[in-house]
Amino acid sequence: MGQAVAAYLHFLSIFVLFALLVLEHRLFKLPLDLERARSLVRIDIAYGLAAGVVLLTGLARVVWYGKGLDYYLHNSMFHAKMGLFALIALFSGFPTFVFLNWRNALKAGRVPEVSPGKAKAVIMVIRLELLLVLLLPLFAVLMARGYGVMGN
């Protein structure tokens, strides 16, 4: 039963993560208004929490369920998937820092100022994250089918 719950929570958190990223992409456009700016901050926090749940449930599946830790540690698709997840996490830092820099303006009830160049960069990073998140299931499927097993 634990394996099913861990798998369900893992998949659900991935769907939530993707939905939040799509929502971020949809809401981030100039000119910003106060309500959308506040929503973007909240959505980004939820996105970070969803990423944490993805990571924790994924680790639970690797350590306690699935094919055993040894299988995953000796599978290049697993390493590619983890590397891709880490890369997505690094990219997500840019929009997060932009949103965190809005705190003072939002506390003062002001709309944050965002240059067109910075807005374009944030949008491009979010689009890149969306693309990379779509590659994660490819590595998962290949790994589950036995591709990438290193040495015997």
Regions from the PLM with identified roles:
Residues 1-152:
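Polytopic transmembrane helical bundles with strong interfacial aromatic enrichment
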